[in-house]
């Protein structure tokens, strides 16, 4: 719809004021390409919200859950032949005493290494849901099959209760 400016009332100043934002006069010093004012730079207090928290310690019930035993680490550095070069555990750098005690579980009969492999495998490799379901249901299905073969009455349909008539 076209804009109609009414000149019938004779007051041209009021009419000019209604359309004045659409025109720019030569005497006005406005920068058409002026950018909007920039917000102030964020202070460092804002960035503290995004600060990474330290990793929590493992629970006391699982002291060696996240670190392999010493023997597993030593076995991974067992002597190997690489084009005539070989290295052994003697070539490993020595850590300070406390660092070794905190970093490794040195119990030779401890099964945490196997648990660590399973835990890391579950966390990082990821299994399909169907593989997990099958592995969980296999023991239950085996028990059901054994129970069905042991009891001969398992194939018989259970008896239905007689109809109950209430005398009221």
Swiss-Prot record:
Q: Where is this region: Disordered?
A: 26-94, 146-168
Keywords from UniProt, A to Z, are: Nucleus, Phosphoprotein
Major place of localization?
Answer: nucleus
Where is it found, in Gene Ontology cellular component terms? nucleus; spindle
Localization, UniProt? Nucleus
Please give the residue positions where the record annotates the modification Phosphoserine: 59, 67
- Output the Gene Ontology terms for molecular function: DNA-binding transcription factor activity
Looking at the record's lineage, which domain of life comes first? Eukaryota
The answer to whether keyword Nucleus applies is yes
Pfam families referenced in this protein's UniProt entry, alphabetically: Myc_N
What PANTHER family does the database record attribute to this sequence?
MYC PROTO-ONCOGENE (PTHR45851)
- State its role: Seems to act as an inhibitor of cellular proliferation.
Q: What is this protein called?
A: Protein B-Myc
Q: Which organism is it from?
A: Rattus norvegicus (Rat)
Q: What is the lineage of its organism?
A: Eukaryota, Metazoa, Chordata, Craniata, Vertebrata
